[in-house]
Amino acid sequence: MNLRPEEISQIIKNEIERYEDKLEVVDVGTVIQVGDGVARVHGLENAMAGELLAFPNEVYGMVLNLEEDNVGCVLLGYDDDIVEGDIVRCTGRIVEVPVGEAMIGRVVNALGFPVDGKGPIVTDHRRPVEVKAAGVIERESVNQPIQTGYKAIDSMIPIGRGQRELIIGDRQTGKTALAIDTIINQKGEDVICIYVAIGQKDSTVAQIVGQLEENNAMDYTIIVSAGAAQLAPLQYIAPYSGVTMAEYFMNEQQKDVLIIYDDLSKHAVAYRAMSLILRRPPGREAYPGDVFYLHSRLLERAAKLKAGGSITALPIIETQAGDVSAYIPTNVISITDGQIFLEAELFRSGIRPAVNPGISVSRVGGSAQIKSMKKVAGPLRIEYAQYRELASFAQFGSDLDDETKAQLAKGERIVEILKQDQYDPMNVEDQVLILYAATNGFLLDIEVKDIREFEKGLIKFAQKKYPEIMTKVKGKDGLSDEVVAAFAECIEAYKKVFSKSV
């Protein structure tokens, strides 16, 4: 093909006009040290704290230390294929997780990837895991209850929507059981539940998933699992991923969310491991100086918003030999709005849930209690505390006056009434009825060993014979004269039925 000179010059002009400078400037560095899930990278002069770095073989890292001549970052994947001299690129973004309706009913890891074998999660929404908590102006005071289904807690240590209530106790005292029962009790309440397992055994998480599925609770629950075999950085990120998923429902859909962190002791240990490997200066119990901020910025994201929606946080802390004055327990106690203390001694003596109401407290939940529960809970707490004090003195002497004996008898029945089996949460109206019976002396002529049986029978009897009164208990009037009279009539009527069956 012959081309004329003017055609050639025209083609060259066209090519010059079409030419685009497609140079991409990327901040790159070199790995100078790697090991124990941590890498030091030289040359990333513009790296930002918390930024994602791209390593070879699709491994990502997160910047934690910004030093004079290098950057210290934790790896969100295994370091087996990363060697000194590898090229690392800045990404200009921070860790993000998928959020949205598609997450409900799924078990995901700390980065939001499914681990339940049910296929990929399809969602268009992603959110950064670290965001600023809602400000004071956006919040409103806690005024709605979140029912745990436990009589001892809903009456004496009530929890409100938007509250942060710590569950604290030694290992094997029923902390996780209390959290799981609270999730089961949210059925039909239009509450999204998120359970974050930090450093738990995979077998334990599988057991929890099975229990929630059995009770149809996975229909409104997301499980975020960073197991004991996972890397410390993933255990560190897991609670922030969980609360990010919760914030989507609170902010975008104005829904109420319940989030459980099980447990923050292991979260602090994971952060300590990362910090020590990064050579950050250790402080008390070898934790870094910012371990308080680690938990405060997480728990401050729980809120009740004026625009609607809330996040209620139930962090769990494991104590050693009941020592609540250790570093991490005192930190989290000072951040939260109260704590439920579960005592190993009570647990072993058969009082379950093993709540110690003496040092358990809810600072803001009282204003969220329903009217009828508030009325029965007042005398209950006082009488229970008096009974515990009297019982400790009564064991030293046998010559007790009649009034003391009556108080002890009433206290024994209150203790028995507050016992509850696992996976057996109770409706608030049923709780009010049985606590009313206990605090007003209706159970004094029932043997202590028969109390639990009497309780079950009374609830069934009331639901069958007095259904309209049971619905009024949750109303604005609370324990009106009409309800109180109906309660007394109902209890006396059932006592006659029960006495014939015993």
Curated annotation (Swiss-Prot):
Signal peptide: none annotated. It catalyses: 4 Na(+)(in) + ATP + H2O = 4 Na(+)(out) + ADP + phosphate + H(+). Its EC number is 7.2.2.1. The keyword Translocase applies. It is a peripheral membrane protein. Belongs to the ATPase alpha/beta chains family. F-type ATPases have 2 components, CF(1) - the catalytic core - and CF(0) - the membrane proton channel. CF(1) has five subunits: alpha(3), beta(3), gamma(1), delta(1), epsilon(1). CF(0) has three main subunits: a, b and c. This is ATP synthase subunit alpha, sodium ion specific. The gene is atpA.
